[in-house]
Amino acid sequence: MILLIDGRSGSGKTTFSAKLHSILGWPVIHLEDVYPGWSGLQKASAAVAETILNPALPADERGYRRWDWYASEFAEWVPTPPDSSLIVEGCGAVTEANLAAARAIGDGNAWGVWVELDTQTRYARAMARDDHFEEHWDMWAEQESQHMAKHNPQQLVDWTINVPEQLTWKL
């Protein structure tokens, strides 16, 4: 099974995927490691179907080049975990092509999740997380809006959730 988790910055995608990882043990690919810099949302989104989950590639050739945010350049190759279950999270994760690739390598078992949260709370979370984000907030929000307009991920997903500040599950 493959889960693609999408949503705007600060909505709780990473928190949600971390909780799923702690419960299920599934590996997580964070698109934050794939974005080639602050203007790279669309490129990272395309990489999901092109290299990370591409069913036309042999399993051992799937993966991505990690972006080194400090050096502002690509770093090492990171192979896609060979496990049958996987989480890909980040803005840009859900597109028709990405869902199709996930379904192809996940034997049809792929699901999309949209994480929704109000702008004020998202902004506060993002600023608390990264001191350098404020200067990029507007540019990044524009890329998110372009992704949403082009791919309409909110309509493609199977579930829409709201991740509160404290996420507590009892299973």
What is each model feature region?
Residues I5:
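Hydrophobic anchor at the beta1->P-loop junction of P-loop NTPases
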Residues P27, D33-V88:
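Conserved nucleotide-sensing/catalytic segment adjacent to the nucleotide-binding pocket
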Residues I52, E76-R129:
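ATP-dependent NMP and nucleoside kinases share a basic, alpha-helical "lid"
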